[in-house]
Swiss-Prot record:
It is an enzyme of class 4 (lyase). The active site is at residue 87. Keywords: Carbohydrate metabolism, Cytoplasm, Lyase, Schiff base. The keyword Lyase applies. It comes from the Bacteria. This is Probable fructose-6-phosphate aldolase. InterPro entries: Aldolase_TIM, F6P_aldolase, TAL/FSA, Transaldolase_AS, TSA/FSA_arc/bac. CDD domains: Transaldolase_FSA. Its EC number is 4.1.2.-. It comes from Streptococcus pneumoniae serotype 4 (strain ATCC BAA-334 / TIGR4).
Length: 222
């Protein structure tokens, strides 16, 4: 089970990399847009400095045609290093690019997955991660859990090294459901992780223990 942060905000990454068992940081053009006019590859280097050498970083191509996707991928790896994961949408051109890039030794995250067949094709093309869009599928009345379950079953049946990296979450319940359905990893915004600890009962339990200890020991520490 892997937990990744879906953000390029350095304050969020610094905070949550110290709290979470962080497996990686994911990004896309929409996430980059939230940060304003940044030097994108300098920001990726800053992220690497914050999270260390072990967690993965995932960067998305922009071009939509086969040759353009390859050029984007080559530039990303030149700028961000050989260990970067290239996010490629599973379109006809994207699937072709995934096959070509895997032959060149690239790490690939197949993204924009809404259907089982997209995921199955990405598995066969050699993608390291598959990123089904959980909330976006829900909004289209697609059974997100069923898609994840079928892809997880295919991975297990074929003993494939591909992993399901579920993305596009609006709440913790969706994250829980994705993992229960068979996702190997999830990526979510800092707000989703924040909400995981927002239940008042959690803090009340901690406060009660502290108060009870204070009654018998007159101290707020052991």
């Amino acid at each position: 089970m892997e937990f990744m942060l879906d953000t390029l905000n350095l304050d969020e990454i610094k905070k949550w990399s110290e709290i979470l068992p962080l497996a990686g940081v994911t990004s896309n053009p929409t996430i980059a847009k939230r940060e304003g006019s940044i030097n994108f590859f300098e920001r990726i280097k800053d992220v690497r400095e914050l999270i260390g050498s072990t967690p993965s970083i995932h960067v998305q191509v922009i071009s939509q045609d086969f040759e353009g996707i390859l050029k984007d991928a080559h530039k990303i790896r030149r700028q961000a290093g050989d260990d970067i994961f290239i996010k490629v949408p599973v379109t006809p051109a994207g699937l072709r690019a995934i096959k070509a890039l895997k032959k060149e030794g690239y790490h690939i995250t197949a993204t924009a997955i809404y259907t089982v067949i997209q995921g199955l094709l990405a598995i066969e093309a050699g993608a390291d991660y598959l990123a089904p869009y959980y909330n976006r599928m829900e909004n289209l009345n697609i059974d997100s859990n069923s898609v994840i379950r079928q892809l997880a079953l295919a991975i297990d049946r074929q003993n494939s090294p591909s992993k399901i990296l579920a993305a596009s979450f609006k709440n913790v319940a969706q994250v829980n459901n994705a993992l229960a359905a068979g996702a190997h990893a999830v990526t979510a915004g800092a707000d989703v992780f924040e909400s995981a600890f927002a239940m008042p009962s959690i803090q009340k339990a901690v406060d009660d223990f502290s108060d009870d200890w204070f009654v018998i020991q007159n101290s707020r520490s052991i």
